[in-house]
Amino acid sequence: LPVARLIAIALLLAILPARSPAVEINILTGGPTGTYIQIGRDIAKAAEECGLGMTVHESAGSLENFLGVRQRPVTQFGIVQSDVLEYLKTFAANDPEVSRAIFGVRIAFPLYDEEVHLLARKEIGGLADLEGKRVAIGVENSGTFLTASLVLDLAQVSPGERLMITQDESLTALLAGDLDAFFYVAGVPAKLFASEEIDADSFHLVPIGDEVLRQVYKPTEIPAGTYPFQTGPVEAIAVKAVLMTYGYDPRRNAYHRESCKAVSDISHVISSRFQTLQETGHPKWKQVNLTELPAGWDIGECVNVGLAPAYRLPCDPPEAETAATPVDTTSESEANRAYRRQICAVVGC
């Protein structure tokens, strides 16, 4: 279990930095040009308009973000891919290290889908053809690295070489003949694949439709013409970006109490300004479904506090009556049922 072990070992060896004297609000996102950091900046802007300061941090991606929420003080939020959450939850029951690694981490909000791209030489027709080949899987600790590793493991495919390099480096190597294929997880359309250097006679997006993967990932399709070299639709899978938080206990101490309030405040900002985020934020906000919760994970109690009808911030407009649409929540935890009721009351279902 390479990915789960990596997370567990990193947690066990982590050294906690000194805690700040006052609780700040922080979110871990991703690289400087990625979607995660833009989503984080949108949230921070909405928070600022409400008089709340939130610092947006670059990171290596999902793994660092999960570790940060779990282990790093004054780091209340981090964006993590849903397949990593699924993998951890699956193995936590039988692996004490993994169980400790995920303890206390909770969902804040589900976000948007990200498509798994696999660009390869034309003769590679499917995942099985990657056996023994040179395959780039992204920089270590990035979301692409984690997803590519999981996809290859689940499909039981063993490339001859797994290169941990950036997507730009991967494309250069592929075009030069030094690579057979590379993975890239990014929302469609991904700017990288707009390059006119990608010759349709030599390269293509490999369809990913393996049944075992479709049971774990969301089946999707990359429409024809999304990229200059792509003439037809391509079967694909998608992962969901999820905003994660920690299950702070306000009864424990002042730090937990203040951190819980920070989570409640930001949760209130996101839910009450969701329409504005969709209208003025990154285009991916338009694809966010706040009720599409990953299975097996609970909403943080501090999140639900911020979603309660009575929760108010000084920047809130006058209260208005909103009728909630009834939803079937009988199979969920009480925390998730409460979340759905309150989200439906705010944004509708």
Indicate residue ranges for each PLM-predicted region:
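Bacterial N-terminal signal peptides
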Residues: 5-15
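Sec/Tat signal peptide C-region and signal peptidase I cleavage site
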Residues: 18-22
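Bilobed "Venus flytrap"/periplasmic-binding protein-like clamshell domains
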Residues: 23-48, 114-176
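Pocket-flanking alpha-helical
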Residues: 40, 57-99, 170-173, 189-197
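Alpha-to-beta junction loops
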Residues: 70-79, 134-135, 176-184, 200-201
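Pocket-lining segment of extracytoplasmic ligand-binding domains
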Residues: 158-262
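Segments of small-molecule ligand-sensing domains
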Residues: 236-349
